[in-house]
A protein has these predicted regions:
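Short, acidic/polar
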Residues: 33-49, 231-251
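N-terminal structural segment of carbohydrate-active enzymes
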Residues: 1-128, 136-137, 143-147, 157-159
Length: 298
């Protein structure tokens, strides 16, 4: 995009932005502490941001992520609490890339519509929408129930008998159960994963520690972590699936993606995916969270 001008981004977490509980309870539930809602981000709020000089609003925590709150009555898969950090969970442990987090909806059954209305309000106030894109990892119990018809889920056709295959979406520690150093519960409450999948922070064994991202699973972009070999032809399944996710949200009116932990995903994917998205949405902007300065200009 040319002549974009100066961008001023305001990060806004709907869950926290409009919360009204004056005395929140430490480690409290949503029933105790409440949660802000997308509908509460009204034109008054948005106009005030615009008047401050803000050009883009980065809405954090929109995409459905692991949580200890039970929404199974709405057809949402319940997360095992032992692979959720905190009651609210992390907005970077995605459980369904094609859905909206129910905590921030007034009417859970209309959560996507409420997001679409938020996008419309934001645009009507002269602002752009930034959404998180988390390409490196997903929640351990990732399962998309809201994916469009014909879309194949991550890991759906993986060969779990192989540690690495370019056709797999995950890495599997074959013959080993997931055995982190943190408590995984007992009996019916126990979290069981076999074979163990590699953990999000490049932990390629079955025993991540409490400081690892043990609640997440690393995505496989066609790189064998043991020897660094790259298998990008034909295009890996993960590339196509993640690009489809970008296109889905761009079609919802998202103007920019704040891309999480960019350096943990092959540069080649970014060149390919950005070009694919811009074929249909040439004005979409990609913003990188990047900690490897060696690939800054890649």
């Amino acid at each position: 995009m040319n002549n974009i001008g100066k961008i001023i981004i305001y990060q806004l977490c709907p869950r926290l932005f409009t919360i009204t509980q004056p005395n929140p309870v430490f480690n409290g539930t949503i029933a105790q502490n409440g949660a802000g809602k997308m509908n509460q981000i009204d034109t008054r709020v948005l106009n005030s941001l615009r008047d401050m000089g803000v050009t883009h609003v980065w809405y954090t925590g929109i995409v459905q992520h692991a949580s200890k709150t039970d929404y199974s009555a709405y057809g949402i898969h319940k997360s095992n609490p032992h692979v959720v950090k905190g009651n609210a969970g992390s907005p970077y442990a995605i459980t369904d890339y094609y859905d909206v987090d129910p905590d921030i909806a007034v009417d859970v059954s209309q959560r996507m519509k409420e997001f679409e209305q938020l996008v419309q309000r934001t645009h009507a106030c002269g602002l752009k929408v930034v959404l998180d894109f988390v390409p490196n990892h997903v929640a351990r119990q990732y399962r998309s129930l809201a994916k469009p018809k014909g879309v194949e889920d991550l890991g759906q056709t993986d060969d779990k008998g192989m540690f690495f295959s370019p056709n797999n979406n995950f890495y599997y520690i074959t013959g080993k159960p997931f055995s982190p150093s943190v408590d995984m519960g007992e009996g019916d409450d126990k979290y069981v994963e076999y074979p163990a999948k590699a953990t999000g922070n490049d932990c390629f064994h079955e025993c991540p520690g409490g400081n690892d991202w043990f609640e997440t699973v690393k995505l496989n972009y066609g790189v064998d972590p043991w020897n660094g070999s790259k298998h990008f032809s034909p295009i890996p399944s993960t590339w196509t699936k993640m690009c489809d996710i970008l296109l889905f949200w761009a079609a919802k009116g998202v103007d920019a993606f704040r891309c999480d932990m960019v350096h943990m995903v092959p540069v080649e994917f970014w060149h390919w995916a950005i070009a694919k998205v811009k074929e249909q949405y040439p004005d979409v902007v990609f913003i990188a969270e990047l900690y490897d300065v060696g690939i800054y200009h890649s």
